[in-house]
Amino acid sequence: MTNEEELVVLADEEGNAIGTAPKATVHTTDTPLHFAFSSYILNPRGELLVTRRALSKKTWPGVWTNSMCGHPAPDETNADAIRRRGVSELGLDFGSFLDIQVVLDDYRYRAEDSSGIVEWEICPVHLVRLAVGEFVEPLPDEVEEFAWEEPQKVFDAVDATPFVFSPWMVDQLSHPELRQAILEAFDPEA
């Protein structure tokens, strides 16, 4: 999709696809409901990748958030979109994806940033396990900085200072099943 216009899939309130719109124009003060995905990426040691959104981002610039978010292209599965964005946005090796599982299948949210731009998404939340290493080389226009952290440290930080993190990350981590899935992902006793 490097030379093509990136499209997002629009949705109705029931979660049906109803068309497409250019990603470059869809996020406004009157953003239509559309499909997205959110992912939490773990390395083989069970550390969670957290990213700080680039300062040039249209929404929530400079805010810490989960590993990666994005939009599936028309006729693309979320798992394929996660692989595509993981390679293009984070510089992950395509072969490093061990497992992608949906944890919050029916997650959706609406949030408005300080500039009035709205995110309104049907956004299943995924847990991604990497088979090897943690080499990340993110695109500077997507990610300002990143860190691999122990999941419990991330949970504690989100609980103590939610204003430092994206509203979707704070809301997603309010679901105990997501926290449990992250903690158990590489736990041999789980």
From Swiss-Prot:
InterPro entries in UniProt? Idi_bact, IsopentenylPP_isomerase_typ1, NUDIX_hydrolase-like_dom_sf, NUDIX_hydrolase_dom
Q: Where does Mn(2+) bind?
A: H27, H34, H71, E119, E121
Binding locations of Mg(2+): C69, E89
Enumerate the active-site residues: C69, E121
UniProt GO MF annotations: isopentenyl-diphosphate delta-isomerase activity; metal ion binding
Q: In which pathway is this protein known to take part?
A: Isoprenoid biosynthesis; dimethylallyl diphosphate biosynthesis; dimethylallyl diphosphate from isopentenyl diphosphate: step 1/1
Show the catalytic activity: isopentenyl diphosphate = dimethylallyl diphosphate
Q: Which CDD domains match?
A: NUDIX_IPP_Isomerase
Q: Which domain of life is it from?
A: Bacteria
Localization recorded for this chain is: Cytoplasm
Q: Which UniProt keywords apply?
A: Cytoplasm, Isomerase, Isoprene biosynthesis, Magnesium, Manganese, Metal-binding
Family according to the record: Belongs to the IPP isomerase type 1 family.
PANTHER family cross-referenced by the UniProt entry: ISOPENTENYL-DIPHOSPHATE DELTA-ISOMERASE
Q: What is the role of the protein in this entry?
A: Catalyzes the 1,3-allylic rearrangement of the homoallylic substrate isopentenyl (IPP) to its highly electrophilic allylic isomer, dimethylallyl diphosphate (DMAPP).
Name used for this protein in its record:
Isopentenyl-diphosphate Delta-isomerase
Q: Source species, please? A: Corynebacterium efficiens (strain DSM 44549 / YS-314 / AJ 12310 / JCM 11189 / NBRC 100395)
